[in-house]
Amino acid sequence: MAASTTPTSGTVGLARRRPDPLRVTALVFAAALLVHGADHLRRGVDVVTPEVFWLGTLQLVLSLITVALIFRGHRWGPAFAVGIGFASAIGFSAAHLLPHWSAFSDAFTGAHHAPEVTAFSWFAASFEIAAGLALGIAGLRAVRGTHAS
């Protein structure tokens, strides 16, 4: 009787692939969006200026579009990741880390800092800034990888 050649590991037909760095980074960025949004809800949406509210809403919509493009494998996903990732990191840094400078400030520092700022607020803003930078870098790498082939 011949020996069975049927694999028993349960991984028949499944190739082990490395996760796509852009998708992983997009997931982290989406998580950062949720955490940062939760902090704004905790602090109250009425503590920010209308300019901050509407610019933040636009950033959220464009971020969700970016994440969707990345997960659909759309050719514009990496380019959107570069634009939204770096713009988010710069925008959140300017709004939260600089002392109050304009109607676009939701400053965590300075004499006129935003109300209800806690350690969680600092974590949320820092997480979103870092995730934005990571998304921008992952997008650049994906764009360069696409052009290199």
Describe the role of every protein-language-model region:
Residues A2-A30, I137-T146:
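Cytosolic juxtamembrane helix and N-cap/initiation of the first transmembrane helix
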Residues D20-P21, A119-S149:
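Membrane-water interface at the C-terminal end of transmembrane alpha helices
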Residues A32-R43, F86-A103:
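C-terminal TM-helix exit segments that contain a strictly Trp-centered aromatic cap at the helix terminus
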Residues H36-L62:
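Transmembrane alpha-helix entry/boundary detector in multi-pass membrane proteins
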Residues G44-V48, A94-S121:
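Interfacial non-cytosolic loop connecting adjacent transmembrane helices
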Residues L58-L64, E128-L133:
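Core segments of transmembrane alpha-helices
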Residues V61-R72, I137-A138:
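Alpha-helical transmembrane segments in multipass membrane proteins, preferentially the mid-helix core
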Residues A68-L97:
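Loop-to-transmembrane helix junctions at the membrane interface
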